[in-house]
């Protein structure tokens, strides 16, 4: 352990791993892997609470989570590089179980006295895992051999003292390692779908080795959140931004359950909404929520702010900033308002900052967590910021929200502005609304609305020549986007039936006179994002 402390540069900290609190958790240290959030999802699916934190997070920042074990994620670095990120020494001193994945395994090796070197035989993609031992808790119930997903260019040349190889692949003699102190390493990614039995390993680690209990439920989360909201708000006043989506609906319902009439909901029509969206949203909220709701017509204000702007990142910044200004204006009218409630989710937080880890790059700003001006006078309250989308839906069901709201497809905070390539104008908004209405109508008619994660139209800035009747046309190109996903962190393009795509295309070019060409986006995430901007 002295080796680990010296290599991490950390001082020894006194840790009592046996302290009992109301919650137990798995803490995941992020080293910059694109799959880090998937690890968290897999643990949450087991009804065990977990959090993803930066690899250099000090003990005092996670002690309240009552960790029962640690997972070290993968990452793009090599542990033998001078500035390579390493795990804090306290995870080894805690006597708690540790599981390193890919780079995390190499960090364990390096910090505990082993040797990691560059490999001439890199492994990227599928491999077959073969066990070296008959009985091991970590690999219990794993098929022999088992397909796994590899993504590494370094290898373990020498195991740390006390460790042994538990499994191997054709090009990797140490694909799984472990010692008698329940410190393990995997040279593959058990969290991805390409490792079909990877969940077995994670379950073995969480339940059999860390001895966690599957007791983290949305019912428990509601009670805990209500207590936290009451403590945070006190006798203050809260305004909540309603969008009509499940996120803001759940936030409003949860906060209202906690503080009642201390909450005022504000619905802003920014002119970037879909057809009939404002009317439908107000109808649902007034009939099912029983809350104080203020409707704000800010169409002119938003469209003027967006005039001449074509850069997608700038659009998001402007819209986010304008939203806050609107809420500040409304807060002044209402009197003393202390908090702004938002439906920020865990993936929003991860994508918008330079990751939880300092080792990966920012993808793009999110409306809920980006574009906020430095002078913002309202304090934020974000009770969903550690939840995934599917967890928010479960929470909404637990709170008694109508299915129409719970299962509504995600709609971005910046609205149609980021589905119009180039400058946003009133004319383009009407064109896109008409095309999008057709897409949604036909998707619902085909009973595929709940089979896809999102489906929508994009108005591109491309125009092309066409022929309608005896006349030449020069119209816009509209793209159709439909994806399947679990959490929006990764997504695959939806294999919609050709007949359905044909119907949608024919309706758009015949009913939206400004459009004469329709294409279907067959890109997955990654490398593309779900939204075009």
Swiss-Prot record:
The reaction(s) annotated as catalysed by this protein in its Swiss-Prot or TrEMBL entry are: XMP + L-glutamine + ATP + H2O = GMP + L-glutamate + AMP + diphosphate + 2 H(+)
Q: Where is the Glutamine amidotransferase type-1 domain?
A: 25-215
What the entry lists under InterPro entries is as follows: Class_I_gatase-like (IPR029062), GATASE (IPR017926), GMP_synth_C (IPR001674), GMP_synth_GATase (IPR004739), GMP_synthase (IPR022955), GMPS_ATP_PPase_dom (IPR025777), NAD/GMP_synthase (IPR022310), Rossmann-like_a/b/a_fold (IPR014729)
Q: Where is the signal peptide?
A: none
Pathway linked to the protein:
Purine metabolism; GMP biosynthesis; GMP from XMP (L-Gln route): step 1/1
Which positions are catalytic residues? 102 (nucleophile), 189, 191
The entry's ATP-binding residues are 243-249
**Cited CDD domains:** GATase1_GMP_Synthase, GMP_synthase_C
Q: Which UniProt keywords apply?
A: ATP-binding, Glutamine amidotransferase, GMP biosynthesis, Ligase, Nucleotide-binding, Purine biosynthesis
Instruction: Return the EC number.
Output: 6.3.5.2
A GO cellular component term found in this entry reads: cytosol
Uppermost EC category: ligase
- What residue stretches are annotated with the GMPS ATP-PPase domain? 216-408
What Gene Ontology terms describe what this protein does at the molecular function level?
ATP binding; GMP synthase activity
Task: Describe the protein's quaternary organization and the partners it interacts with.
Answer: Homodimer.
Q: Enumerate the PANTHER family for this protein.
A: GMP SYNTHASE [GLUTAMINE-HYDROLYZING] (PTHR11922:SF2), GMP SYNTHASE-RELATED (PTHR11922)
This chain's function reads: Catalyzes the synthesis of GMP from XMP.
HAMAP family documented for this protein: GMP_synthase
Which protein, by its recorded name, is this? GMP synthase [glutamine-hydrolyzing]
Native species: Dehalococcoides mccartyi (strain CBDB1)
Q: Which gene encodes it?
A: guaA
